[in-house]
C-alpha cells in the first residue's frame, strides 16, 4: 500500500483551499460606498481682501509672545506672570496634554511585540482507596517556566494609522495648552484695562464732586449777598450727593475689578487688595501688522489645533478601513517543564510552540461598516469645525480692525468735545460768579462736561480693549512649531480620500 505523503495531501487539497479562500474573500465585510463628505475651505475663498485692504495697522510683525509688555505697566506684567504660574485652567490644559501624550505611547506599544514570562508548580496526590497501591497514595508534581510571545502583524497599516492619529491629537492638545495661556494673558489684560477704566470714572466723579462743592459754596455766597434764592442753593446742594454716588459707584467698580483680577491670577479676593492703580494704557503701543489672511492660518492656535484634529480624524479612517482586511497574529511559547524543579535546566525538559493565526472578517452584522461610517462622520465634523474656525477668525480680525480704526477717530473727536465742554463750563462759571449768568447755565455746562468726560473715558477704555482683542484675533502671540507651520502650509480644499 502506497503511503500518503504530506506533499500529495497538499497537492490534492490545494484547489479546495484556494477555492475556500477565494469564497471567503468574496464574502468578507466590505467598506464599499463609505467615505467622508467634508471639504476643507481655503482662506482665499472667503474673500476678505477688500475689507482688510485699508487696515493700515503698521509694518510690525504678528503679536509677540509677550505682546502685553508693550503697554509698559510692570504691575500688569507681574499679574500675567502670576496667572500663568498658578491658574487652574492651565493645569487642566496640561493634564489634557498629558492624556494625549499617554495615548501616543499606548498606540505605539500596540505596534510592538509582547513578551512575558510565567512560572509555576503544580502537585497532585490521588487517594489509594480509589486507584490502588500502584497508582494511588503517591505524590506527583511538575514545575514549569515559559516565555510567551505574541505579535499582531500590521499588514495594512491600521496600527500605524492609529498611532499617527494619536500623534496628531497630541499636537492639537499641545496647541490647546498654548492657547489656554495666551487666552489667559489676554483676559488678564482686558480685566486690567477694565480696572484702569474704573479709575478713570473715579477721577471724573471726583472732579465732578469738586465742581459741585465749589458751585454750592459760590451759590451760598450769592444767596448771602442777596443775588440767589434758596431754590438755587437747593439745586446746588442736590448736585453734591449725586456726585458722591457716582464716586461710590466708581469705587465699587474698582473693587470688583480687583477681585476679578485676583480670580484670573488664580488667587483669593485678598490678592486684589494689593493691586495698585494701573498706569495709563496707550492702545497705540500695541503695534499690529498689516493683516495677510493666508498668514493667519499658522498664527491662530484654534485654527492650527482644528487642522491637527482633521488630520487625526483622517488617520482614524485609515485605521477603520484596515479592519476590513485579514489580520495575522503570531504567538509562540517556549520553556521548560519537569517533575522535579532541579531537572528544569536539563535539555530534555524544554518545549516550544508556535502558532500563526490568520483572521478574516466575513460577517459581523455590519459592525465594521458602522465603525467606519462613524469615523467618516468624525472627519466631517472635524472639517466643519475647522471651516467654522476659519470663518470666525477672519470675521474677528475684520471686526477688531474696524473697531480700532473707528475708536481712534471717535476718541479724537470726543477729546475735542471735552475741551469745548470744559471751556464752556469755565465761561458759565465766570459769568455766574460775576453775576451776569444764571445757575441754570452752570448746571447745563457742568452736566455736558460730565457726560463728555465719561464718554471719553469709555472710548479710551474701548480703544485698549479693541487693541487687545485684535492682538488675540491675530493669534495672541502664538508661536507655531515647525510641524504646525508645515501642517498649515499643507492646507487644501480636498476631502480625505
Language-model features: where?
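Terminal intrinsically disordered/low-complexity segments used for targeting and assembly
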Residues: 2-6, 14-85, 143, 167, ...
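Short flexible linkers and secondary-structure junctions
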Residues: 29-187, 328-332, 362-372
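Small/polar, glycine/serine/threonine/aspartate-rich low-complexity segments that form flexible
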Residues: 62-71, 120-148, 162, 271-289, ...
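Membrane-embedded beta-strand positions in outer-membrane beta-barrel channels/transporters
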Residues: 80, 144-148, 192, 237, ...
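Sec/SRP-type N-terminal targeting helices
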Residues: 91-92, 108, 153-181, 231, ...
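Periplasmic alpha-helical coiled-coil/stalk elements that build and connect Gram-negative outer-membrane
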Residues: 175-292, 403, 427-430, 448-450, ...
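A short glycine-centered flexible hinge/capping loop motif at secondary-structure junctions
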Residues: 223-227, 432-436, 473-477
Amino acid at each position: 500500500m502506497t503511503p500518503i505523503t504530506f506533499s500529495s495531501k497538499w497537492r490534492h487539497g490545494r484547489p479546495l483551499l484556494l477555492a475556500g479562500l477565494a469564497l471567503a474573500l468574496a464574502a468578507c465585510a466590505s467598506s464599499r460606498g463609505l467615505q467622508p463628505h467634508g471639504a476643507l475651505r481655503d482662506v482665499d475663498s472667503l474673500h476678505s481682501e477688500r475689507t482688510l485692504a485699508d487696515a493700515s495697522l503698521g509694518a510690525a510683525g504678528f503679536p509677540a509672545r509677550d505682546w502685553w509688555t508693550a503697554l509698559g505697566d510692570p504691575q500688569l506684567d507681574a499679574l500675567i506672570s502670576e496667572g500663568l504660574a498658578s491658574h487652574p485652567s492651565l493645569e487642566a490644559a496640561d493634564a489634557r496634554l498629558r492624556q494625549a501624550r499617554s495615548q501616543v505611547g499606548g498606540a505605539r506599544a500596540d505596534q510592538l511585540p509582547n513578551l512575558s514570562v510565567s512560572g509555576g508548580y503544580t502537585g497532585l496526590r490521588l487517594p489509594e482507596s480509589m486507584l490502588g497501591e500502584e497508582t494511588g497514595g503517591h505524590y506527583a508534581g511538575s514545575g514549569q517556566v515559559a516565555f510567551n510571545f505574541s505579535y499582531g502583524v500590521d499588514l495594512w497599516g491600521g496600527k500605524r494609522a492609529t498611532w499617527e492619529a494619536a500623534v496628531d491629537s497630541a499636537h492639537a492638545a499641545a496647541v490647546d495648552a498654548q492657547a489656554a495661556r495666551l487666552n489667559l494673558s489676554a483676559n488678564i489684560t482686558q480685566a486690567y484695562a477694565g480696572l484702569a477704566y474704573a479709575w478713570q470714572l473715579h477721577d471724573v466723579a471726583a472732579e465732578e464732586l469738586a465742581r459741585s462743592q465749589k458751585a454750592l459754596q459760590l451759590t451760598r455766597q450769592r444767596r448771602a449777598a442777596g443775588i440767589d434764592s434758596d431754590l438755587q442753593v437747593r439745586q446746588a446742594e442736590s448736585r453734591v450727593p449725586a456726585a458722591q454716588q457716582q464716586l461710590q459707584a466708581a469705587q465699587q467698580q474698582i473693587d470688583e475689578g480687583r477681585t476679578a483680577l485676583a480670580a484670573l491670577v488664580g488667587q483669593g479676593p485678598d490678592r486684589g487688595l494689593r493691586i495698585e492703580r494701573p498706569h495709563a494704557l496707550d492702545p497705540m503701543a500695541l503695534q499690529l501688522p498689516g493683516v495677510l489672511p493666508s498668514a493667519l492660518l499658522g498664527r491662530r492656535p484654534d485654527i492650527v489645533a482644528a487642522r491637527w484634529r482633521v488630520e487625526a480624524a483622517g488617520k482614524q479612517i485609515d485605521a477603520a478601513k484596515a479592519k476590513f482586511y485579514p489580520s495575522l497574529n503570531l504567538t509562540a511559547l517556549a520553556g521548560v517543564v519537569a517533575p522535579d524543579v532541579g531537572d528544569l535546566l536539563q535539555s530534555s525538559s524544554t518545549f516550544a510552540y508556535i502558532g500563526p493565526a490568520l483572521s478574516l472578517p466575513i460577517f459581523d452584522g455590519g459592525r465594521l461598516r458602522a465603525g467606519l461610517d462613524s469615523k467618516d462622520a468624525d472627519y466631517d465634523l472635524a472639517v466643519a469645525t475647522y471651516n467654522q474656525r476659519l470663518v470666525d477668525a477672519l470675521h474677528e480680525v475684520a471686526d477688531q480692525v474696524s473697531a480700532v480704526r473707528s475708536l481712534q477717530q471717535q476718541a479724537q473727536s470726543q477729546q475735542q468735545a471735552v475741551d469745548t465742554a470744559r471751556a464752556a463750563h469755565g465761561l458759565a462759571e465766570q459769568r455766574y460768579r460775576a453775576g451776569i449768568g444764571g445757575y441754570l447755565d452752570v448746571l447745563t455746562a457742568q452736566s455736558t462736561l460730565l457726560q463728555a468726560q465719561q464718554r471719553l473715558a469709555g472710548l479710551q477704555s474701548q480703544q485698549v480693549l479693541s487693541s487687545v482683542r485684535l492682538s488675540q484675533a491675530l493669534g495672541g502671540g502664538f508661536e507655531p512649531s515647525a510641524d504646525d507651520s508645515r501642517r498649515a502650509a499643507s492646507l487644501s480644499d480636498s476631502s480625505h480620500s
